[in-house]
Regions:
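Hydrophobic alpha-helical scaffolding
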Residues: 128, 148, 202, 230-234, ...
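Conserved S-adenosyl-L-methionine
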Residues: 173-277, 282-292, 297-301, 332-333, ...
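Extended hydrophobic-aromatic, low-complexity segments
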Residues: 284-288, 328-329, 338-342, 358, ...
Length: 522
């Protein structure tokens, strides 16, 4: 029941925002809609959190402390001067200078909150020259939205919704800007990033970081033990990520600027304990033929081909892993069996004992693409060792010559009409199998299950030409074995005969009616 209520809330919020954007028609280029709406949405979101905190301060300490910044800082809430508060904006919504007031509000918020440096648009609304009446109508629509949602990556989700509407018009790729919450949760639950450096080389709106920190907090961990590093190529998305993290009090190093991870790596010397990523799928011409050929990230491997960046992303991730680092990332299924240079790199990864698990995900998990997707798990140290993790000891067995394959295509529940999501129960089943397989005593806690999971040896993978397609290893039941085809065909024969008889009767009835009307069909 709780999930249904939440879904309805998210849908109504998205629909309201889309309705809001539609009010801009004729005043702003469609490609600008999302930026106009999202900055105002952020302003309302920040204001609502500020007012909530302000009321608590007044109730606890009295009115005279209501405008003391330290009280807001310690609660990870942005301090908003009066001219930056949503109430002030709404009260002045119909004024001729409302665009200037919005720009001033955003500038003042950034000036008063160092964590937002470089995150908010500068003099944006004044430059757009939006019709005052349409801007007032937009503000009124956004004012109706309830931003009180503590469980979802709201800003990222809303941003993704807008991207899905404009992706084709703007020439963007599909799926790389936002990763559905259930997938991020699955990756976090498998990797368990309780303590260390967490990195995302293509962080989008920062959703991976948001859900990872929530995972740590949900398991009584300390988010201060997690250091976050990320990089994002698109400037507007880079700003959004800074907003998304800052508004939740999450400290992060996203580099000096928005930049291409391959050609302008913002974290060249970084070694991460955990890497989570959803790179652009099948990115073409990601480098020139003579570019990056001697890049140190490819050391020990073939140079990834220019035709597809998938293995460029994989090797970038491998190069960033610490001695005991583990990575979970998404790629299109083609990367599992590509030939040529990709095959050579894949063989090297397997021979270097880096591939830990390959998990096929259900279709229709993403809002912007129905492409089939795989979750890869790489582990820099698959040897036997004992690790203390969030106050508990984990005894890992040696898995260097094994790879776990899983197929989740029969999992998932309907979500938002044509989409599906991996439920909490689905994820618990997957993570339980994965963690049991990793640890000592797995003989008692893990077993290969037809159509679900299989632990393959290095020799098996080698015999199959180093393909990582799960269906080459997982046993699938032949559901046709017990079918009596003669009986089945006779049954179908009878049904077809009955349908043909009915068709002839219907045809005769129709001809008779037309004849009686004087419009006979010869």
């Amino acid at each position: 029941m709780a999930r249904t209520a939440k879904t309805k809330k998210e849908i109504s919020m998205e629909e309201a925002l889309w309705k809001s954007a539609d009010k801009l028609r004729g005043s702003v280029e469609p490609a600008e809609y999302k930026h106009v709406v999202l900055s105002l949405f952020f302003l309302k979101f920040a204001s609502d959190k500020f007012e909530e905190c302000r009321n608590k301060i007044i109730a606890t300490h009295g009115e005279k402390y209501a405008d003391m910044k330290p009280f807001y800082t310690q609660e990870n809430v942005f301090y908003l001067p009066e001219e930056s508060r949503w109430k002030y904006i709404i009260e002045n919504a119909k004024q001729d200078d409302i665009a200037l007031k919005i720009d001033t509000a955003l500038y003042t918020i950034e000036k008063n909150n160092p964590a937002l440096k470089g995150a908010l648009p500068d003099n944006y609304y004044s430059r757009l020259h939006i019709d005052t009446a349409k801007l007032a109508s937009l503000l009124d629509e956004i004012n109706r939205i309830n931003t009180d949602d503590k469980e979802n990556d709201i800003i990222g989700r809303v941003y993704e919704y807008f991207l899905s509407k404009f992706a084709l018009a703007e020439g963007k790729g599909k799926g790389e800007f936002y990763t559905p919450k259930c997938i991020v949760n699955l990756i976090a639950e498998m990797l368990e990033p309780y303590d260390g450096i967490l990195y995302d080389p293509c962080c989008g709106s920062g959703g991976m970081f948001v859900q990872s920190i929530k995972f740590v907090e949900a398991h009584s961990g300390n988010k201060k033990k997690v250091s976050i590093y990320g990089q994002e190529y698109t400037n507007t998305t880079f700003k959004l990520a800074k907003m998304n993290l800052a508004i939740r009090g999450i400290s992060a190093n996203l580099g000096e600027m928005a930049a291409n991870t391959f050609t302008n790596d913002q974290h060249k010397d970084l070694k991460a304990d955990f890497i989570m990523a959803n790179p652009p799928f099948n990115q073409k011409q990601w480098r020139a033929e003579n570019e990056l050929v001697d890049d140190p990230r490819w050391n020990g491997y073939e140079v990834p081909p220019t035709s597809n960046a998938n293995y460029g992303w994989i090797l970038n991730i491998v190069s960033k892993l610490s001695q005991n680092g583990v990575a979970g990332f998404l790629l299109a299924n083609g990367a599992l069996s590509d030939d040529g240079t990709e095959l050579k790199i894949r063989q090297q990864l397997i021979e270097n004992h880096l591939v830990e698990a390959i998990i096929i995900l259900p279709r229709n998990l993403f809002y912007t693409t129905d492409i089939s997707v795989t979750l890869w798990v790489l582990n820099k140290n698959k040897k036997a060792r004992v690790v203390e993790q969030n106050g508990k000891l984990k005894r890992y067995r040696n898995r260097e010559d094994e790879i776990l394959f899983m197929d989740l295509r029969q999992m998932g529940s309907p979500y938002e009409k044509k989409y599906i999501e991996l439920t909490e129960e689905d994820r618990a089943k997957v993570t339980s199998v994965y963690h049991n397989w990793q640890q000592e005593g797995y003989e008692e806690t893990y077993e290969n299950v037809p159509e679900f999971c299989y632990s393959a040896s290095f020799e098996e993978v080698k015999e199959k030409g180093f393909t990582l397609v799960p269906s080459r290893y997982i046993e699938f039941v032949n559901r046709d074995e017990n079918i009596d085809f003669d009986t089945k065909m006779k049954s179908l024969q009878g049904e077809l005969k009955e349908l043909l008889v009915q068709e002839e009767k219907s045809k005769a009835d129709l001809l008779k009616v037309m004849e009686e009307l004087g419009y006979g069909i010869n």
